[in-house]
Amino acid sequence: MLIENRFLKYISFLISFIFITYVIYIIISSFSIVKNQFIDIGDTTYVNQVRTDDYTIKLANHLTKDCASNKVCEVQAMLDFVTKIPYKINESIARSAKQVVEQNFGDCDDKSNLLISMLKVKGYEAYFVLVPKHIFVIVNLEQKLQNLKALYINEKRFYILESTAIGSKIAFPLKYNFNEIEAIL
């Protein structure tokens, strides 16, 4: 027998068991991360870069500091900030909110990641909407906005936020047919 001492033998079994359990945990965690961050939509893959880090929290709070908890003001202030960032096609995967701000450009997925990250840290229910060759954000606002159209999902009112149109306002008109919506994430 390789190990004569019973105590050492049991300790080695325990260490082996803990190691194997840890490896299995890492593998399962990795699958979960990939499943939630890389989403296949037809023949393309969307990379979720939504972040709720300190940078995004400070940015969202700074942009909404003059809104006195007015939800429409908060959403529009964040949307205004994002739409002022120049649109430029990014051939690589979607970038984080901080990267978009620091590099001062982004395409639809970059700018939508920035916008939805800020909305999430401020507590808004918001989702990505994927349509052919484009992505935009929808946000739930309890307040009904007069003379503006909303999308209703599970009886909740959502307004379209278009991050790539300079000066875009809440409730941007839907430029796609409903059957062109590939996913709401």
Protein language model regions, located:
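A structural boundary/capping signal
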Residues: M1-L185
